[in-house]
């Protein structure tokens, strides 16, 4: 959770929307390979008009003390989160996309969007489990010489991502945890 002051009512509304739209009960295999009796399909919220607006607003509030020019992460989970932040009220913040690997054709880029040379960036994710997705994006950005100031996520599953991200020397913030969704 963020140490910054965020709108409590907006956060509660987002939690309700995610419970309604994105929590799917039934056995699933997570990206970590572990089994769970529910799945949080946050894309159902990040691609929902009202929830997306709340996500953009709240993540801007949660990271207001971090200095960054652009926001993005590993495609696909990070894409709508980044654009929600980009379109939220406030200063101009560009968005970018990090591919899992560089394209084999065209410009053969791994990082798409505006030129990030000399820019500071925030890496985002819809849901963190192991921290591998945001750290894959962090590695690609660092390899390209881009400074990453932190990682932020909509929902943290409390399965160690915070520790893995901290081990990379990055601060980490989340809007919601499992208890906020009635899943602890």
From Swiss-Prot:
Entry EC number(s): 2.4.2.10
Cofactor(s) it depends on: Mg(2+)
Keyword Lyase carried by entry: no
Keyword tags: Glycosyltransferase, Magnesium, Pyrimidine biosynthesis, Transferase
Pathways involved: Pyrimidine metabolism; UMP biosynthesis via de novo pathway; UMP from orotate: step 1/2
InterPro entries: OPRT, Or_phspho_trans_dom, PRibTrfase_dom, PRTase-like
SUPFAM superfamilies documented for this protein: PRTase-like
Catalysed conversion reaction: orotidine 5'-phosphate + diphosphate = orotate + 5-phospho-alpha-D-ribose 1-diphosphate
CDD domains from the UniProt entry: PRTases_typeI
Binding-site residues, orotate: 129, 157
GO MF terms held by the record: magnesium ion binding; orotate phosphoribosyltransferase activity
Gene3D superfamilies: 3.40.50.2020
Family classification: Belongs to the purine/pyrimidine phosphoribosyltransferase family. PyrE subfamily.
SUBUNIT field: Homodimer.
Function according to Swiss-Prot or TrEMBL: Catalyzes the transfer of a ribosyl phosphate group from 5-phosphoribose 1-diphosphate to orotate, leading to the formation of orotidine monophosphate (OMP).
Protein name: Orotate phosphoribosyltransferase
UniProt gene name: pyrE
């Amino acid at each position: 959770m963020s140490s910054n002051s965020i709108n409590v009512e907006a956060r509660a509304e987002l939690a309700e929307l995610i419970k309604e739209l994105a929590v799917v009960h039934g056995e699933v295999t997570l990206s970590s390979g572990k089994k769970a009796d529910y799945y949080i399909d946050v894309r159902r919220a990040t691609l929902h008009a009202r929830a997306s607006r709340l996500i953009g607003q709240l993540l801007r509030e949660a990271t207001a003390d971090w200095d960054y020019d652009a926001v993005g992460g590993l495609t696909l989970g990070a894409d709508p989160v980044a654009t929600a932040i980009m379109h939220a009220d406030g200063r101009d913040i560009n968005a970018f996309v990090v591919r899992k690997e560089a394209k084999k054709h065209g410009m053969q880029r791994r990082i798409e969007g505006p030129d990030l040379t000399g820019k500071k960036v925030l890496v985002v994710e819809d849901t963190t489990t192991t921290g591998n997705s945001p750290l894959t994006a962090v590695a690609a950005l660092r390899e390209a010489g881009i400074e990453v100031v932190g990682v932020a996520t909509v929902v943290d599953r409390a399965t160690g991502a915070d520790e893995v991200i901290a081990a990379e020397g990055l601060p980490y913030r989340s809007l919601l945890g499992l208890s906020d969704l009635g899943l602890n």
